């Protein structure tokens, strides 16, 4: 019978995913890439919540992850609508070119 995967592996994966999300958020100039980086950070935090919830044999982490996913889905819908509107008005997705709300 196989042994279970250690908790530290999940937390390490979560830290790596979060670091990649932060790097993408800080160093990329495309709005879509920045948006995906934010979602990656949210999913890394969700992985940590589920890992700690599993370790402590409680359901709270799973429930909190569910609520984070619901909020992230709503944020994705609104965020993508805003991104589409910005692209329609400016014809670019570069953050440096979209620096104000004025036309």
UniProtKB/Swiss-Prot annotation:
UniProt KW Nucleotidyltransferase keyword: no
GO biological process: ATP synthesis coupled electron transport
Molecular function terms, GO-annotated: NADH:ubiquinone reductase (non-electrogenic) activity; quinone binding
Predominant location: membrane
Subcellular localization, as worded in the UniProt entry: Cell inner membrane
Annotated EC: 7.1.1.-
Superkingdom of source: Bacteria
Membrane topology type: Multi-pass membrane protein
Keyword annotations from UniProtKB, A to Z: Cell inner membrane, Cell membrane, Membrane, NAD, Quinone, Translocase, Transmembrane, Transmembrane helix, Transport, Ubiquinone
Reactions it catalyzes: a quinone + NADH + 5 H(+)(in) = a quinol + NAD(+) + 4 H(+)(out)
Cellular component annotations (GO), alphabetically ordered: NADH dehydrogenase complex; plasma membrane
Spans through the membrane: 7-27, 31-51, 63-83
InterPro entries named among the record's database cross-references: NADH_UbQ_OxRdtase_chain4L/K, NUOK/Mnh_C1-like
Top class in the EC scheme: translocase
Entry-linked NCBIfam families: PRK05715.1-2 (NF004320), PRK05715.1-3 (NF004321), PRK05715.1-5 (NF004323)
Family designation: Belongs to the complex I subunit 4L family.
Subunit structure: NDH-1 is composed of 14 different subunits. Subunits NuoA, H, J, K, L, M, N constitute the membrane sector of the complex.
HAMAP family to which the protein is assigned, alphabetical: NDH1_NuoK (MF_01456)
Name recorded for this polypeptide: NADH-quinone oxidoreductase subunit K 1
Species the sequence originates in: Solibacter usitatus (strain Ellin6076)
């Amino acid at each position: 019978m196989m042994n279970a995967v250690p908790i530290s592996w999940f937390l390490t994966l979560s830290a790596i995913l979060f670091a990649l999300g932060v790097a993408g958020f800080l160093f990329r100039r495309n709005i879509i890439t920045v948006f995906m980086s934010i979602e990656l950070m949210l999913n890394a935090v969700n992985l940590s919540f589920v890992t700690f919830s599993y370790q402590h044999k409680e359901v709270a982490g799973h429930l909190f992850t569910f609520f984070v996913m619901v909020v992230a889905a709503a944020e994705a819908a609104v965020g993508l609508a805003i991104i589409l509107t910005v692209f329609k008005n400016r014809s670019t997705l570069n953050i440096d070119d979209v620096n104000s709300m004025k036309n």
